[in-house]
Amino acid sequence: MESENILEAKQVSVAFRIAGKFQKAIYDIDLSLRRGEVLAIVGESGSGKSTLATAVMGLHNPNQTQITGSILLDEEEVIGKTGDSMASIRGSKVGMIFQNPLTALNPLMKIGQQIKEMLAVHDVYPENQYESRIFQLLEQVGIPNPKRVVNQFPHQLSGGMRQRVMIAIAIANDPDLIIADEPTTALDVTIQAQILDLILEIQKKKNAGVILITHDLGVVAEVADTVAVMYAGQLVEKASVEELFQNPKHPYTRSLLRSNPSAETVSDDLYVIPGSVPSLSEIEYDKDLFLARVPWMKEEAQKVISEKMTEISSNHFVRGQAWKKFEFPDQKLKGGKK
């Protein structure tokens, strides 16, 4: 019987070798993704979002990285797999759309060759169908005149066209999971919308699971089913998109949402989250990492110990108890939300 979950990650930690010793970049991550679900992972730069994605893809250097825990992809364990054993999974069961297609694509290979290479690694399609499959993929992602594009190099295409090629490569072998790592960051607004619509169209057609890594909360509200918030390598909150936007609990989640401008913003000054994400050498995972960054909560931060994620309501998980103590300064003065 086919499992409902395409991805199950349990107690996943990733550590990088830095100056001769391993330092954890992400710690104790538990996540699952159902077929047909869109999971958005949000957080500032340095929160560990892409590190988690590359762990799922098996893209870390095993000599410089330690990965512990369990990552089941379609019920198959991927932690510990390297070389050909991981290559057989990457591209067939999971495909990844990278942030910058200009650096992700090979500048010395024509577009058609790059898609053919992805098909040749796996046995999903026979060799005599490669050419027709390449044209089919390029048409599917909305590229006009595929016969011309297959003979072009990446630099000859626009940014939007290159990202469409990246999507074609990612879905070439019909993976059950698509990871989109900031797929629209380098594109203008109108092209961003087209690319997001394309990803969702493919997801619905194939009933694939999608992990969308982004810092754009507007995009999250529009396309996600579930949201996972990461901070300094930890998952701090996870809930349905409706629940998270209407009833955020963790101080970091609330700060992210408050700093996001909207049409309803009436204050002259936008809220700015104080400080910055700590470096790997500064992280103490037994402390509440975000409270230590907030000036008016530093004293409280010393008393709050970081705890595991707990379910505070149906499918709404929050790390620790800090959310019960956190208030914005103006809330203390006015006794309520601004």
Swiss-Prot record:
Membrane topology per record: Peripheral membrane protein
Keyword set, alphabetical order: ATP-binding, Cell membrane, Membrane, Nucleotide-binding, Peptide transport, Plasmid, Protein transport, Translocase, Transport
Catalytic activity: a [peptide](out) + ATP + H2O = a [peptide](in) + ADP + phosphate + H(+)
Start and end residues of each ABC transporter domain: 7-257
Superkingdom, taxonomy of origin: Bacteria
Keyword Protein transport: yes
SMART domains referenced in this protein's UniProt entry, alphabetically: AAA
First-listed, main subcellular location of the protein, grouped into a coarse class: membrane
Purpose: Part of the ABC transporter complex OppABCDF involved in the uptake of oligopeptides. Probably responsible for energy coupling to the transport system. Essential for uptake of peptides larger than three amino acids and for growth in milk.
Family label: Belongs to the ABC transporter superfamily.
Assembly information from the UniProt record: The complex is composed of two ATP-binding proteins (OppD and OppF), two transmembrane proteins (OppB and OppC) and a solute-binding protein (OppA).
Protein name: Oligopeptide transport ATP-binding protein OppD
Lineage of the organism: Bacteria, Bacillati, Bacillota, Bacilli, Lactobacillales
